Amino acid sequence: MILMEDVYKKYPNGITAANGLNINIGEGEFVYVVGPSGAGKSTFIKMIYREERATKGKIIVDKFDLINMKNREIPYLRRNVGVVFQDYKLLQSKTVYENIAYAMEVVETEPSVIKERVMEVLDLVNLKHKVRMLPDELSGGEQQRISIARSIANMPKVLIADEPTGNLDPDTSWEIMNILEEISNRGTTIVMATHNKEIVNTLKHRVVAIENGRIVRDEQQGEYGYEV
């Protein structure tokens, strides 16, 4: 599902954020990406959905060749890769319904399908009753749940979660993780960057640790491994 071979990413300022990454993530896997701040986790995550382009190497995501991909092909990749951000990135002037529908409208989904699918994903995140509200009428946890609903609206094969609980209190963080677990149980591949030691050590999954742009640890049912 996700393959990286000898992947490097060097920025114009000379910083090397990926220094020979090699990893194979299978269909349906749930993988935590951990490591110190500035270790290269965000670059690793962003290369998977082509927000960043690797300097050299090989990256395959669901049969898409990301190194040689043309910019015009990126939207096709992102139909198959959903992304959840720490800061939600909801459209503040649009309702909950409109935020989720927009993700499908841009890929020209039929209106009848959009309506049905919006309600399906809102049911998954337990927010059908908030469908007509604006983002600023929601709590932080509710906004993140809407962000997750939007990210899976197109039924992606891969879901990228970049610090999805970073701005949330502990109870709300567990609510978000329960939703991600349910999505994982339905067969979606999930790659989640996190600094949350308790979550990683409690909800056991594969753990990949990155330091100085290198994978230094890759363990099934792993531990967080860093002091916080």
Q: Which residues does each PLM region occupy?
A:
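A short, proline-enriched helix->beta-strand linker immediately N-terminal to the Walker B motif
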Residues: 153-157
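Short coil-to-helix segment of the ABC ATPase nucleotide-binding domain corresponding to the Q-loop/switch region
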Residues: 94-101
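Catalytic Walker B motif of ABC-type/P-loop ATPase nucleotide-binding domains
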Residues: 159-162
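Conserved ABC transporter NBD signature motif
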Residues: 57-65
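Helix-to-loop junction immediately C-terminal to a conserved catalytic motif
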Residues: 49
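Conserved ABC ATPase signature
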Residues: 133-138, 142-144
